[in-house]
């Protein structure tokens, strides 16, 4: 940082006035046992994950059951969880399957529509209304503690962050947004 210079992999140096390292996030599936594409939930955060989720969805609609969708603690982008819930709801309705699929949205947000931003306009009321209209239940202030095949373990917290209720949510299909971390190459670099 003192020299405004970065060394490249081939040994060359690049001088700069301002340096932005835009790497995208590290998806921290490993923070929760059983989370993610190598565990028991799906992700849409990467093209490869979305392709796998689509394949699993096609199998799911042949033998539907409960869905758990949402964002775990440490996630910083909540909109895709709502969007994906509404996409699944719409597809299930078109297939005349929605009445056979209970849906629960699990989020670490303090309230529906917080979106990691303290809300956007009247997002709380609009999203609560949209979820109710679609018969999608929700759990806020949630911490996913473990995911097993067919069961998501969730601790619901009160406003002070104290555990309020334990949930063991059954699911046949789940898409959960993971925590986002800095990639290994830049974590711990000063400046």
Predicted regions and their residues:
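Glycine-rich beta-alpha-beta "Rossmann" dinucleotide-binding loop(s) and their flanking helix/strand
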Residues: 10-12, 19-49, 160-191
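Pocket-edge structural micro-motifs
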Residues: 10, 71, 156
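Short, charge-rich binding segments
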Residues: 11-14, 58-60
């Amino acid at each position: 940082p003192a020299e405004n210079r970065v060394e490249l992999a081939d040994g060359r140096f690049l001088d700069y006035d301002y340096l932005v390292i835009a790497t995208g996030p590290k998806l921290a599936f490993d923070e929760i046992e059983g989370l993610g594409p190598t565990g028991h939930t799906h992700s849409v955060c990467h093209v490869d994950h979305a392709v796998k989720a689509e394949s699993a969805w096609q199998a799911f609609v042949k033998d539907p059951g409960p869905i758990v969708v949402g964002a775990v603690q440490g996630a910083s982008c909540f909109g895709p969880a709502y969007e994906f819930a509404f996409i699944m709801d719409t597809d299930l309705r078109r297939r005349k399957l929605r009445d056979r699929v209970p849906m629960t949205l699990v989020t670490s947000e303090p309230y529906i529509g917080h979106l990691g931003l303290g809300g956007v306009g009247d997002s709380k009321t609009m999203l609560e209304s949209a979820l109710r209209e679609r018969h999608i239940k929700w759990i806020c202030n949630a911490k996913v503690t473990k995911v097993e095949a067919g069961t998501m373990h969730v601790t619901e917290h009160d406003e002070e962050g104290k555990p309020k209720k334990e949930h063991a949510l059954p699911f046949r299909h789940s898409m959960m947004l993971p925590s986002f971390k800095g990639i290994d190459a830049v974590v711990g670099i000063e400046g």
